[in-house]
């Protein structure tokens, strides 16, 4: 499949009237050093503390029958190599049960280990947070079973529940308490939960599809209050909200949800991950558009600009549960293990993330500067007019994530458009500085009082003052 790569150009804006030049002999001011802000992050012990978690939902499947056809297993060497080659470093095996599908679970662990991929595994012997619910077993038995999983270097933790409803929170709390009682806090072994978001109505936040009996409706804020109580001890927070809908529209609550999550996880001293819409239509759901490269860049870039410490693609594989969907529409790989064009988009995006994650993981998010228009409304809360040495932003529509990086200022400049190519974003500083600029995984050393960045649709560029 032909790989599409947008052209990437980086230039320095030369303002001779202000005495700004790009020559190596130019005198620059050393950037001030500020008190270091506290940072909350989660990384896998096996991968290192400077490797950002980049994941995929739905690990490769065992074989199954579909409409008279047998779909071969995608739990293969080739497919797991593809996970690693795409730049993902963890995968969620939400439908592979270590208890009931042991052989495929073990094979998944072994292949993930071979390709340095971490894996969250389901194990219904320990508990079940899907109906019929099953509380976590006694601590001693839980600990013994957990040791079986820990034999595999690819073991990231256990899969808990995707998109739990409020009426299920008592079950979550019992399981979460037992898990962290046994697993402990001083390691990266985690229990995977994924939260609901503004995609759901207030009634669904509490009682789901009518299965619960909570009388009052919850706002998302109330849902999060109860969610954090139920998942006390969690090592990260993650949620999904898919923005590309209805033939070119954006979900209007996208940035509102990002800001809310940023604020609430800061209160809880938790890092947060987002989901990236890696496909569309899903199970023939026409509401969800199939994203192009600019849309996927935009999802990742805006998440990072708001301080996300990791992200995941939905879906990575084409899951069995989407049996109505056409292969190749809903994820990075199709039903038969074939790579879609979005696999290549993700690979390019993830390559850039791997070049900047050592900075963003170790940076405290301080707010954003928004310039121009936006495809979805940006809340006033969290917005800044300037940040430290950066005094103004000009040019095309943009979001600038503002960070404290070990006492220095760092900025993540994003083209806030999924279609505008060669967008010009001008960063104006209060003096002449030296900068490290990382764009499309390439690093540049630049000097000046202003920088002009030329960005592809949705692209993000990291700027660190030296």
Model-assigned labels for residue ranges:
Residues 21-23:
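Bacterial signal peptide processing site
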């Amino acid at each position: 499949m032909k790989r599409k790569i947008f052209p990437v150009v980086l230039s320095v804006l030369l303002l001779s009237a202000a005495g700004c030049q790009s020559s190596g002999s130019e005198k620059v001011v050393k950037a001030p050093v500020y008190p270091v802000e506290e940072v909350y992050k989660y990384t896998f012990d096996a991968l290192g503390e400077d490797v950002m978690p980049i994941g995929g939902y739905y690990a490769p499947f065992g074989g199954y029958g579909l409409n008279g056809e047998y779909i071969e297993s995608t739990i293969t060497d080739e497919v797991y190599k593809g996970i690693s080659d795409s730049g993902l470093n963890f995968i969620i095996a939400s439908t592979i049960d270590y208890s009931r599908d042991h052989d495929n679970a073990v094979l998944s662990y072994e292949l993930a280990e071979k390709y340095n991929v971490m894996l969250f595994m389901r194990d219904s012997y320990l508990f079940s947070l899907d109906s019929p619910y099953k509380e976590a077993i006694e601590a001693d038995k839980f600990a013994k079973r957990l040791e079986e999983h820990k034999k595999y270097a690819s073991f990231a933790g256990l899969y808990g529940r995707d998109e739990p409803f409020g009426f299920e929170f008592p079950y979550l709390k019992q399981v979460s308490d037992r898990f962290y009682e046994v697993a402990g806090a001083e390691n990266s072994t985690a229990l995977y939960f994924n939260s609901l978001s503004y995609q759901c109505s207030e009634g669904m936040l509490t009682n789901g599809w009518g299965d619960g009996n909570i009388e009052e409706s919850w706002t998302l804020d109330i849902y999060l209050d109860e969610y954090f109580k139920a998942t006390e001890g969690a090592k990260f927070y993650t949620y999904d909200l898919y923005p590309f809908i209805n033939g070119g529209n954006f979900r209007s609550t996208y940035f509102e949800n990002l800001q809310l999550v940023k604020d609430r996880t800061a209160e809880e001293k938790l890092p947060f991950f987002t989901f990236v819409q890696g496909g569309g239509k899903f199970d023939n759901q026409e509401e969800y558009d199939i994203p192009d490269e600019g849309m996927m860049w935009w999802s990742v870039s805006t998440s990072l600009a708001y301080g996300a410490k990791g992200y995941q693609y939905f879906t990575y594989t084409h899951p069995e549960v989407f049996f109505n969907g056409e292969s190749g529409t809903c994820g990075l790989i199709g039903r038969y293990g074939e790579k879609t064009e979005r696999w290549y988009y993700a690979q390019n995006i993830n390559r850039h993330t791997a070049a900047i994650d050592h900075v963003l993981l170790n940076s405290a998010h301080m707010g954003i500067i928004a310039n121009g228009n936006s495809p979805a409304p940006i809340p006033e809360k969290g917005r800044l007019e300037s940040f430290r040495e950066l005094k103004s932003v000009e040019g095309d529509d943009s979001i600038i994530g503002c960070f404290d990086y070990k006492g220095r200022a760092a900025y993540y400049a994003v083209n806030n458009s999924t279609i505008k190519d060669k967008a010009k974003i001008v960063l104006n500083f209060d003096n002449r500085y030296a900068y490290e600029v990382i764009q499309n995984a390439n690093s540049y050393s630049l000097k000046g009082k202003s920088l002009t960045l030329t960005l592809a649709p949705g692209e993000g560029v990291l700027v660190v003052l030296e």
